[in-house]
Regions:
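Accessory alpha/beta interaction modules
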Residues: 1-156, 166-168, 273-281
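Short, charged alpha-helical interaction segments and adjacent helix-coil junctions
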Residues: 2-15, 23, 79-85, 170-281
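Interfacial alpha-helical end/capping and short helix-turn segments at domain and membrane boundaries
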Residues: 161-162
Length: 281
């Protein structure tokens, strides 16, 4: 069977990727063991991942979807969302809060008591020092202002960055060393991070891994093109410039599927107006 040939721009893109890039991080997170190693390092404790879904899309109560870089379920039932962010071009804390709320609502069964609401940890990894206070890792706690006591509500947010190195203690040292692997394409550390290093080596230094990455880059490019077409159609329908039946046909979707996709992306589906008796005359 002939191997797929990829264009030069795809190959060139793949040869520049590091784990901070969504496409490589997604492939890295297809390995449960790799996710387990990342999370254990950042939490500073051994944990067991029983399920992981890279680039998971889930819906909030209004039907709007959010795309997560990586969502893991731990043995004790806690959900961990790991996000990577290269550019400093978003309201990062609002994104973390939104992700956590959607995961909580999505993973909490109906009719349960509040004490059984899903517990969520969001780990937000950036290339830049998000708070500018010179720490490689930040833990955000709920503190009672009047007493200074820390209260927990089942949500934990942790911010990690690759811009600051600190070797004052074991946690900071481990996090700093792990971030080196996120930013330096050639660097491996099989002694300290065997699973991460093995997975990264596959995509950086082997023909098989490069081929997988090329396939993923091309797949994401096709998805972006398709998404751009859909958004144009959604905007046309929402603004009244296109009939929803025509737009659904152009998108190769059934009418109900098209309307569902509009709602998932936050667009308003125009309601069909009923003709009154007076208007019919």
């Amino acid at each position: 069977m002939a191997k797929t040939r990829f264009n030069a721009s795809t190959v060139a893109t793949v040869k520049q990727l590091v784990p901070f890039d969504d496409v490589m991080f997604q492939k890295m997170c297809e390995s449960r063991e790799t996710c387990q190693e990342i999370i254990s390092t950042i939490l500073g404790q051994d944990i067991r991942v029983i399920d992981v879904v890279p680039q998971d899309s889930i819906e909030n109560l209004q039907g709007r979807s959010v795309r997560l870089d990586c969502l893991c379920k731990l043995r004790d039932g806690i959900y961990v969302n790991v996000e990577v962010q290269k550019p400093d071009n978003a309201d990062h804390e609002a994104r973390v809060r939104y992700n956590a709320s959607v995961i909580t609502a999505n993973q909490t069964p109906k009719g349960i008591k509040f004490r059984d609401v899903a517990q969520v940890i969001v780990i937000y990894i950036t290339r830049f020092d998000i708070f500018g206070d010179g720490r490689p890792i930040y833990h955000i706690d709920r503190v009672v202002r009047e007493t200074g006591k820390v209260r927990t509500d089942g949500f934990t947010e942790i911010y990690v960055n690759a811009a600051v190195k600190n070797y004052d203690d074991e946690l900071n040292t481990n996090v700093s060393d792990l971030m080196d692997l996120f930013t330096d394409r050639e660097k491996l550390n099989p002694e300290k991070f065997p699973e991460f290093s093995k997975r990264k080596n596959l995509f950086v230094n082997t023909e098989k891994g490069e081929r997988e990455m090329c396939e993923k880059v091309d797949q994401l490019a096709r998805e972006r093109e398709h998404e751009a077409v859909l958004v144009t159609l959604f905007e046309g329908v929402q603004d009244g410039g296109l009939r929803v039946t025509y737009a659904a046909k152009k998108a190769n979707l059934s009418l109900n599927e098209f309307k569902d996709q509009m709602r998932l992306r936050g667009f308003s589906v125009p309601q069909r107006r009923r003709r009154t008796a007076a208007a019919a005359k």
